Amino acid sequence: MIEFYRPYMEELGFRQQLLADGETMSFDPRGTIDFPEKKWAEWYRRWLEPEGGERFYRYIRDSCSGELVGEAAWYFDDVRNIYICSIITAAARRGRGYGGEALELLCREARAMGISEIYDDIAPGNRSVGLFLRHGFAVVSSDDVAVLVKRQL
């Protein structure tokens, strides 16, 4: 079982580690992402203050052990006029069902905020396409850059 946890700014070290881990970020064509402490305050203000329908961010925590295992988010893409979601599970914690549970919880949270559909852009060949399809998403479009999936909430 998992739960979402809203981190304090001082706890963004977990996100920093997650984004710096090559195996965890192997799904992203950009590879690892630099997230130095000097960027935390601005990022925190943008993603977690104030809360509303434009952005949502939480750590994924194993509710039995209390261990942080990943992150879940959505944001409103005002260019395409859609909500984009993101689930990142630490590589060392994959294969235990955390991603699927987090995806379901993220969709419930989005629905509770009045969001009627949610999307994700996934790199072609990424195993998570199957995860999204198993959890009610459908492929909207696909090219050599991204597979766009969508779920009605």
Region locations from a protein language model:
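A short, well-structured alpha-helix characteristic of acyl/acetyltransferase catalytic modules
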Residues: M1-E42
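Acetyl-CoA-dependent GNAT
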Residues: I33-I84, A90-A92, D143, L153
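Long, contiguous binding/interaction regions
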Residues: E71-F76, L106, M113, L131
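Conserved beta-strand-loop-alpha-helix junction that forms the acyl-donor binding cleft
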Residues: A90, E109, Y119-G130
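Conserved acetyl-CoA pyrophosphate-binding loop and the N-cap/start of the following alpha-helix
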Residues: R93, G97-L105
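Conserved active-site alpha-helix within GNAT-family acetyltransferase domains
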Residues: G100, P124-S141
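Active-site/acyl-donor-binding loops of N-acyltransferases
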Residues: H135-L153
